[in-house]
Protein backbone atom coordinates (compact mmCIF):
# COMPACT_ATOMS: atom_id res chain seq x y z
CA UNK A 1 0.00 0.00 0.00
CA UNK A 2 2.94 2.30 0.52
CA UNK A 3 3.66 2.54 -3.23
CA UNK A 4 0.05 3.54 -3.88
CA UNK A 5 0.31 6.25 -1.24
CA UNK A 6 3.43 7.53 -2.99
CA UNK A 7 1.59 7.68 -6.30
CA UNK A 8 -1.39 9.61 -4.93
CA UNK A 9 0.55 12.69 -3.78
CA UNK A 10 2.33 12.77 -7.14
CA UNK A 11 -1.06 12.68 -8.85
CA UNK A 12 -2.44 15.35 -6.51
CA UNK A 13 0.22 17.92 -7.34
CA UNK A 14 -0.59 18.06 -11.07
CA UNK A 15 -4.28 17.78 -10.23
CA UNK A 16 -4.11 20.87 -8.03
CA UNK A 17 -2.82 22.80 -11.01
CA UNK A 18 -5.55 21.35 -13.26
CA UNK A 19 -9.35 21.23 -12.66
CA UNK A 20 -10.76 18.92 -9.97
CA UNK A 21 -12.49 16.69 -12.52
CA UNK A 22 -9.17 15.48 -13.85
CA UNK A 23 -8.09 14.64 -10.32
CA UNK A 24 -11.12 12.40 -9.94
CA UNK A 25 -10.39 10.77 -13.28
CA UNK A 26 -6.69 10.16 -12.61
CA UNK A 27 -7.07 8.51 -9.20
CA UNK A 28 -9.66 5.90 -10.27
CA UNK A 29 -7.80 5.30 -13.53
CA UNK A 30 -4.82 4.05 -11.53
CA UNK A 31 -7.00 1.95 -9.25
CA UNK A 32 -9.52 0.48 -11.69
CA UNK A 33 -8.00 -0.45 -15.04
CA UNK A 34 -9.73 -3.83 -14.91
CA UNK A 35 -13.06 -2.30 -13.92
CA UNK A 36 -12.79 0.15 -16.81
CA UNK A 37 -12.26 -2.73 -19.22
CA UNK A 38 -15.36 -4.49 -17.93
CA UNK A 39 -17.65 -1.49 -17.49
CA UNK A 40 -17.31 0.30 -20.84
CA UNK A 41 -19.01 -2.62 -22.56
CA UNK A 42 -22.06 -2.01 -20.39
CA UNK A 43 -21.71 1.75 -19.84
CA UNK A 44 -20.50 2.90 -23.24
CA UNK A 45 -22.94 0.59 -24.98
CA UNK A 46 -25.79 2.03 -22.93
CA UNK A 47 -24.72 5.66 -23.33
CA UNK A 48 -23.04 5.91 -26.71
CA UNK A 49 -23.30 2.76 -28.80
CA UNK A 50 -26.54 0.92 -28.18
CA UNK A 51 -25.59 -1.40 -31.03
CA UNK A 52 -22.72 -2.93 -29.04
CA UNK A 53 -25.01 -3.82 -26.18
CA UNK A 54 -27.73 -5.12 -28.49
CA UNK A 55 -25.14 -7.19 -30.35
CA UNK A 56 -24.09 -8.86 -27.14
CA UNK A 57 -27.69 -9.49 -26.12
CA UNK A 58 -28.39 -11.06 -29.50
CA UNK A 59 -25.38 -13.32 -29.09
CA UNK A 60 -26.72 -14.51 -25.75
CA UNK A 61 -30.23 -15.01 -27.13
CA UNK A 62 -29.00 -17.08 -30.07
CA UNK A 63 -28.01 -19.89 -27.71
CA UNK A 64 -31.23 -21.87 -27.62
CA UNK A 65 -31.63 -24.83 -25.33
CA UNK A 66 -34.36 -27.24 -24.35
CA UNK A 67 -33.54 -26.94 -20.63
CA UNK A 68 -36.81 -25.22 -19.68
CA UNK A 69 -38.88 -27.82 -21.50
CA UNK A 70 -36.89 -30.75 -20.11
CA UNK A 71 -37.48 -29.38 -16.62
CA UNK A 72 -41.22 -28.93 -17.26
CA UNK A 73 -41.56 -32.51 -18.49
CA UNK A 74 -39.53 -33.78 -15.52
CA UNK A 75 -41.88 -31.99 -13.12
CA UNK A 76 -44.93 -33.45 -14.90
CA UNK A 77 -43.55 -36.98 -14.66
CA UNK A 78 -41.74 -36.80 -11.29
CA UNK A 79 -42.59 -33.60 -9.35
CA UNK A 80 -40.33 -34.49 -6.42
CA UNK A 81 -37.16 -35.20 -8.43
CA UNK A 82 -34.55 -32.62 -9.49
CA UNK A 83 -31.85 -32.72 -12.15
CA UNK A 84 -28.19 -31.70 -12.01
CA UNK A 85 -26.76 -29.20 -14.46
CA UNK A 86 -24.53 -31.89 -15.99
CA UNK A 87 -27.50 -34.22 -16.52
CA UNK A 88 -29.47 -31.30 -17.99
CA UNK A 89 -26.62 -30.60 -20.39
CA UNK A 90 -26.55 -34.27 -21.44
CA UNK A 91 -30.32 -34.27 -22.01
CA UNK A 92 -30.04 -31.06 -24.05
CA UNK A 93 -27.29 -32.62 -26.20
CA UNK A 94 -29.40 -35.75 -26.64
CA UNK A 95 -32.40 -33.77 -27.88
CA UNK A 96 -30.22 -31.73 -30.25
CA UNK A 97 -28.71 -34.95 -31.62
CA UNK A 98 -32.12 -36.56 -32.21
CA UNK A 99 -33.39 -33.36 -33.81
CA UNK A 100 -30.42 -33.27 -36.21
CA UNK A 101 -30.92 -36.94 -37.14
CA UNK A 102 -34.63 -36.41 -37.79
CA UNK A 103 -33.99 -33.25 -39.82
CA UNK A 104 -31.33 -34.96 -41.95
CA UNK A 105 -33.54 -38.00 -42.56
CA UNK A 106 -36.52 -35.78 -43.44
CA UNK A 107 -34.39 -33.79 -45.88
CA UNK A 108 -33.20 -37.03 -47.54
CA UNK A 109 -36.78 -38.24 -47.90
CA UNK A 110 -37.86 -34.94 -49.46
CA UNK A 111 -34.93 -35.13 -51.91
CA UNK A 112 -35.70 -38.75 -52.83
CA UNK A 113 -39.28 -37.79 -53.66
CA UNK A 114 -38.10 -34.65 -55.49
CA UNK A 115 -40.14 -32.39 -53.21
CA UNK A 116 -38.87 -28.95 -52.19
CA UNK A 117 -40.77 -28.97 -48.88
CA UNK A 118 -40.39 -31.10 -45.78
CA UNK A 119 -43.92 -31.89 -44.62
CA UNK A 120 -45.35 -33.71 -41.62
CA UNK A 121 -45.34 -36.89 -43.69
CA UNK A 122 -41.54 -36.77 -44.11
CA UNK A 123 -41.13 -36.03 -40.41
CA UNK A 124 -43.38 -38.97 -39.49
CA UNK A 125 -41.48 -41.33 -41.79
CA UNK A 126 -38.12 -40.15 -40.47
CA UNK A 127 -39.34 -40.72 -36.88
CA UNK A 128 -40.25 -44.30 -37.83
CA UNK A 129 -36.81 -44.79 -39.41
CA UNK A 130 -34.68 -43.13 -36.69
CA UNK A 131 -36.45 -44.17 -33.49
CA UNK A 132 -36.76 -47.83 -32.48
CA UNK A 133 -40.02 -49.79 -32.16
CA UNK A 134 -42.37 -48.71 -29.39
CA UNK A 135 -40.68 -45.32 -29.02
CA UNK A 136 -41.43 -44.53 -32.67
CA UNK A 137 -45.09 -45.50 -32.23
CA UNK A 138 -45.49 -43.21 -29.21
CA UNK A 139 -43.63 -40.38 -30.96
CA UNK A 140 -45.84 -40.67 -34.06
CA UNK A 141 -49.01 -40.66 -31.97
CA UNK A 142 -47.89 -37.61 -29.95
CA UNK A 143 -46.78 -35.83 -33.13
CA UNK A 144 -50.10 -36.50 -34.84
CA UNK A 145 -51.94 -35.22 -31.78
CA UNK A 146 -49.81 -32.03 -31.75
CA UNK A 147 -50.36 -31.38 -35.47
CA UNK A 148 -54.13 -31.89 -35.07
CA UNK A 149 -54.22 -29.51 -32.11
CA UNK A 150 -52.20 -26.93 -34.08
CA UNK A 151 -54.37 -27.06 -37.20
CA UNK A 152 -57.64 -26.91 -35.23
CA UNK A 153 -56.65 -23.74 -33.35
Curated annotation (Swiss-Prot):
Ranges annotated as biased composition (Basic and acidic residues): 1-28
UniProt main location, coarse: nucleus
Modified residues annotated as N6-acetyllysine in this record: 7, 37
Cross-link (Glycyl lysine isopeptide (Lys-Gly) (interchain with G-Cter in ubiquitin)): 149
Post-translation changes: Can be acetylated to form H2BK6ac and H2BK33ac. Monoubiquitinated to form H2BK143ub1; may give a specific tag for epigenetic transcriptional activation.
Family: Belongs to the histone H2B family.
Protein name as catalogued: Histone H2B.3
Lineage: Eukaryota, Viridiplantae, Streptophyta, Embryophyta, Tracheophyta
